[in-house]
Amino acid sequence: MAAVSMSVALRQTLWRRRAVAVAALSVSRVPTRLLRTSTWRLAQDQTQDTQLITVDEKLDITTLTGVPEEHIKTRKVRIFVPARNNMQSGVNNTKKWKMEFDTRERWENPLMGWASTADPLSNMVLTFRTKEDAVSFAEKNGWSYDVEERKVPKPKSKSYGANFSWNKRTRVSTK
């Protein structure tokens, strides 16, 4: 029943678009591209294999990653909000939650002296909108996690005149 009503709605949409295109063509006499109804015919044809695949049940595809089992099940992740850059006064990149993996064994490459690792997840940092999203993702993948709560700085009330007060040690002599 839903497929029939969907195709009727699709047919009406296509006819409206075609009518608008024909009206625009007759008014402006400029060549315009007409929307063909082949997509509607394709949707009506139930015997072809080009239909959309619909899955009735939710499938778990986390086991299809190709990452070895030792890197998946024994991981510990840290969920945090990055600190503000000390060199700037802006708060960019401090609103989203980040997830980074623990550090595994590293060694120095004897030829070049570079730091090497066999861990495919060591340099990966994931970004999430909320803490709950990050925690649910870690639980879904079977990782243990530590959550570092967001540190909100307490605003300091200052006045501009305090920079020029004579009774405080705010002025530095140059001699």
Curated annotation (Swiss-Prot):
Keyword field: Electron transport, Membrane, Mitochondrion, Mitochondrion inner membrane, Respiratory chain, Transit peptide, Transport
Topology of this chain in the membrane: Peripheral membrane protein
Entry superkingdom: Eukaryota
Record function comment: Accessory subunit of the mitochondrial membrane respiratory chain NADH dehydrogenase (Complex I), that is believed not to be involved in catalysis. Complex I functions in the transfer of electrons from NADH to the respiratory chain. The immediate electron acceptor for the enzyme is believed to be ubiquinone.
GO terms for cellular component: mitochondrial inner membrane; respiratory chain complex I
Organism: Pongo abelii
Gene3D superfamilies for the chain: atu1810 like domain
Transit peptide range per the UniProt entry: 1-42
Localization (cell): Mitochondrion inner membrane
PANTHER family: NADH DEHYDROGENASE [UBIQUINONE] IRON-SULFUR PROTEIN 4, MITOCHONDRIAL, NADH-UBIQUINONE OXIDOREDUCTASE
Chief site of localization: mitochondrion
Sequence segments annotated as region (Disordered): 149-175
Mitochondrion is among the record's keywords: yes
Protein name per UniProt: NADH dehydrogenase [ubiquinone] iron-sulfur protein 4, mitochondrial
Recorded family membership: Belongs to the complex I NDUFS4 subunit family.
Quaternary context: Mammalian complex I is composed of 45 different subunits. This is a component of the iron-sulfur (IP) fragment of the enzyme. Interacts with BCAP31 and TOMM40; the interaction mediates its translocation to the mitochondria; the interaction with BCAP31 is direct.
Single annotated GO MF: NADH dehydrogenase (ubiquinone) activity
BP term (GO), one: brain development
